[in-house]
Amino acid sequence: MPRAGTVRAMVRSDKGAARLAGVECDLVRGDVTDPESLQAAVAGCNAVVYLVAVIAGRASDFDRVIAQGTRNLLEAARAADVRRWVQMSALGTRRTTKDLVPYFHAKWEAEEAVRASGLPHAILRPSFVFGPDGGLVPRLARIARLAPVIPILGPGTQRLQPIWVDDVAEIVARCASGEQNGLLELGGPDVVSWNELWARLKTALGTRRPDLHLPFWFVRPQAVVLERLPNPPVTRDQLTMLEGDDNVAEPNDALRFGLPLVPLDEQLRRAVAT
């Protein structure tokens, strides 16, 4: 797809800027929780892609960054005559789940703000996004390489539909150009259980460590303690979300774009090769 113009990335700190070293984009400082910092960030932009989120913290943190942050940037975007908006939400976000955990509540409120904004928009709800640099797969790979057993939460029958990060990036770019509108739920080409995901990951790593299923009731009290850490490995809210499925209802909206979506085994091979 031909693309014109320049990508501008808003970062809060030198650390954020360093992570984009070598990426072809302009950098601008800003913080979605500081409305006054956003005017320069969106000035002259045709489209805004909202990727800001937190995955652990207090309810007020989720609201401040995800929900209110979206409102703040929407206000700046409208004032700057931005013509299009792409919102990165999360699969599982629905009216019926908004009171389940603060994360879903904040994501839902952010979606509602976008829907009410009057801007042409696309709201993306991906399943787990897999990639080589950070995120879930490197964490799982470290466990599979180092732990004596593979800790699987619950029965392991909960389903997920991982999608490769480059596929998501292409979909974001196409939505920013106006190819698709509205709500899009995105998954990769394979729907698997957590049991199967771990089995495939072990195959990719060449390890045969045995599985150990940990009931949610057993892990939840430990999560209470872990939540006191600066970057907890798991929280009670995350356990609540992991108890359910995370696959899209058919049809998979990712198929609208005609992309050769990366199969799960290839996703895992790429992610563990780095």
Q: Can you say where each PLM-predicted feature lies in the sequence?
A:
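Short, amphipathic alpha-helical "lid/cap" segments that border enzyme active or binding sites
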Residues: 35, 39, 45, 71-74, ...
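Alpha-helical membrane-targeting segments
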Residues: 136-162, 203, 208-246
